[in-house]
Amino acid sequence: MKPAWLVLRDGRTFRGKALGAVGEASGEVIFHTAMQGYQEILTDPSYRGQIVAMTYPMIGNYGVNDEDVESRRPWVNGFIVKEASPVASNFRSGASLDAYLARHGIVGIQDIDTRALTRHLRDRGAQDGIISSLAADPAPLLERARALPGLVGRDLVAEVTAAAPYTWAEGGWELSRGYVATPPARFKVVAYDCGIKYNILRQLRTIGCDVTVVPASTTTAQVLEAKPDGVFISNGPGDPEGVPYLIESVRGLLGRVPTFGICLGHQILGLAAGGRTYKLPFGHHGANHPVKDVATGKVEITAQNHGFAVDPASVSAHGWEPTHLNLNDGTCEGLRHREWPVFSVQYHPEASPGPHDANYLFHRFADLMSQKGG
């Protein structure tokens, strides 16, 4: 195996071995605490601009397959593991993790102390870095890492959104039955693609939505022209303030159409409501984050992937209230308007990977559309 380096902008350096494609990759280095679901993570467009380090010590045990992807290709800038399993022990596997990364040009590194890296990022915060399996000397990489642009203010959504509208018809997938039939469509939904995951679209179809996916640049007028029963605003990468055109479009829809936002969509709704967002020290990236429903007191274990959060106090004067709180750090995990049929969550109720505790939120969206006559 070729040697490889990981160099962070604060000078911390790790020597390891090459994984996947040979080359260099740069981006914001973050850690993810899920034990499985690496294929879904790799193909989640929300990771555009980031190098993902998995905290679980062995990754790749079950290989990769065609069904578990969350988009048309991997989107991570780079991938870090302690050990990549050379054996894929799974009858569904079509390739090893290493081969999959190499085929898609994803540069990775393995055989580094991911515990030390995780503690460093926890204490110092997520930061830009470079993986290189080309450099013999890591010293020149440090200056380049310090010159990286970071995520704040950048429009990464434009890099992952759909080029044109399309209709989604595929239902869920089950091990025993494969792709399952979907119910007749009851609602017409326009889904803003900020980096939307396939399993979100499957969940929308499962509750009876005829889903039209539109680019993030779609205007308010274009959405209203479609006469939807509901609007969905998806997950996506980076800083929500980097997409002012989408914020403006969503602002024009508030109170006019039942609306549901997830992850970046939650942040976009917060900004459209006149609120503010801020960057978290190292973000929430994992499949076991406890979230409390303020109204019921019930605790949900949730899948999360975000580096920014909404300040709930900044929207409270505009008719909004927090609905969910993160029990680890107290950050806002959900919002709803007191009068309009609009709500959002910061986490991922569709899971993939992760628990299904919050799947009921899709049915809540269907209920709002039903009440509006959908």
Give the residues covered by each predicted segment.
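A glycine-centered loop/beta-turn motif at secondary-structure junctions
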Residues: 334-371
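RNA-binding accessory domains that recognize and position tRNA/RNA substrates
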Residues: 1-221, 225-226, 240, 352-354, ...
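Short clusters of small/polar residues that mark proteolytic maturation junctions
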Residues: 18-19, 56, 282, 304, ...
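Cysteine-nucleophile active-site neighborhood
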Residues: 229-230, 234-301, 309, 354-369
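Active-site glycine-centered loops adjacent to acidic/histidine catalytic or metal-binding residues
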Residues: 113, 263, 306, 348
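Proline-centered loop/turn at the N-terminus of a beta-strand
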Residues: 107, 188, 258-260, 276, ...
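Active-site-proximal beta-strand elements of phosphoester/diester hydrolases
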Residues: 188-192, 302-303, 343-347
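Catalytic beta-strand/loop cores that center a nucleophilic Ser/Cys/Thr
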Residues: 297-340
